[in-house]
Amino acid sequence: VTGGDPSDEELLAEQIRYYEARAPVYEQLYFLRGTHATDDEAFIRSWRRETSTLERFVEHLDTNGDVLELACGNGLWTRLLAPGSGRLTAIDSSMRMLERNREWIADPRVRYVRADLFTLELDGRFDLVFAGFFLSHIPPGHWRPFWVKVARWLAPGGTIAFVDDVWGPDRPRSGDRVSGGPEHAHVRRLEGSSFTIVKRFFRPDTLVEAFGQAGFDADVSTTGAHFLFGTARRVRRASAMSRG
């Protein structure tokens, strides 16, 4: 993104390029490997304790029906969703991410789709829609229309489940705010290149409010200092019988 304040469309296009470039090393941050390795034992303990909480949450989701994974990446969450799923559709905009996911997971129940989630239309109905570290990459102006669209993909009684970063006083730890640009524009650096992408940090209450504005009731918890997780369901409309 060059010249002036980046538009959301420019940010999203560069975000796709960033994750295409990051695909070979994406999981290093989660597992504290490579350039993300640290000797801080206290940090390592807290990080691993909290990632274990996320994994237990995902492992206990009801995946027996049709499952849709948004921005599936290289398989970090697909590996936990696929074993118990009836059928899993994994979508990402990055071909390199999908290739690494397919190689890592190697499960015939997983159907891979390369698509831009913000322009994608689906005919299917899913019992569970899962988003791992994707909510924080949705621009504010895209939030409500995106989740209204996802609501059409949910089967009756269907659930959205998610894990993501949580807001904290030290956020963002990785990447820099774009000076004078929109609050959700952040610069990420990778192997000598810079990418300006969308990155937002929610607190549980602000995420509940954001989902509410899109027509969902959300239940959000934190793991402690690093992450949040939870579920969201469509708000039940008052029936005609309740009108007085």
Outline where the language-model segments fall:
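C-terminal alpha-helical "lid/dimerization" subdomain adjacent to the S-adenosyl-L-methionine
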Residues: 163-213
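Class I SAM-dependent methyltransferase SAM/SAH-binding core
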Residues: 66-119
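Conserved class I S-adenosyl-L-methionine
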Residues: 2-62
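Short catalytic micro-motifs in class I SAM-dependent methyltransferases
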Residues: 133-137
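Core SAM-dependent methyltransferase catalytic element
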Residues: 216-244
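A conserved beta-strand element that flanks and buttresses the S-adenosyl-L-methionine
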Residues: 130
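A short glycine-rich, Lys/Arg-flanked "PGG" loop and its adjoining helix->strand segment in the class I
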Residues: 144-156
